[in-house]
């Protein structure tokens, strides 16, 4: 099922949805950790990234004073050993306002968020998207890149440390590259 189809289902049922892509590696404690994090936000959130690709940037808002975290991961493509350790991890997780990230390996979306993102992301096109954490703009190549144009405009959040990471193996990816 496509992301957009899941979003439409969320809207139709007026229910929140949690989405995991087929290459998602999920921490073993996600069921214990996620509900208290979400409850911190009350009901005014659109999307919460539970994880993101480790081969690109993560850009989080730390304060209203303009202090952001912009970083890269030490391992772009985790090994199976590293992914196994991740599943067993019990590192502290907090939730932050999201400015930018790539990858949709795992996320929660509200019906309101689904409506807002469907109306802003589709139809998908080759729009130019500024990525401040990269210091440049990119031409969108998929839904996760298009979302970067809207994370700052909607109530988007991300878990850090992540609760989900993708296998993200470029040799077996089903994502078409130009």
Describe the role of every protein-language-model region.
Residues 1-20, 24-178:
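An acidic/histidine-cluster motif and surrounding catalytic segment
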């Amino acid at each position: 099922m496509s992301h957009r189809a899941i979003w439409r289902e969320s809207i139709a049922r007026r229910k929140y949805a949690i989405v995991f892509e087929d290459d998602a590696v999920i921490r073993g404690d996600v069921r214990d950790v996620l509900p208290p994090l979400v409850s911190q936000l009350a009901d005014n959130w659109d999307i919460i990234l539970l994880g993101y690709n480790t081969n690109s940037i993560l850009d989080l808002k730390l304060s209203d004073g303009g202090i952001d975290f912009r970083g890269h991961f030490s391992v772009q493509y985790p090994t199976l050993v590293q992914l196994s350790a991740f599943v067993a991890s019990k590192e502290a997780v907090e939730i932050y306002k999201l400015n930018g990230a790539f990858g949709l390996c795992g996320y929660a979306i509200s019906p309101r968020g689904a409506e807002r993102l469907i109306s802003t992301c589709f139809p998908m096109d080759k729009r130019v998207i500024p990525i401040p954490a990269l210091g440049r703009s990119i031409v969108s190549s998929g839904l996760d890149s298009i979302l970067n144009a809207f994370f700052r405009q909607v109530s988007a959040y991300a878990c850090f440390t992540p609760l989900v990471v993708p296998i993200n193996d470029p040799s077996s990816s089903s994502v078409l590259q130009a």
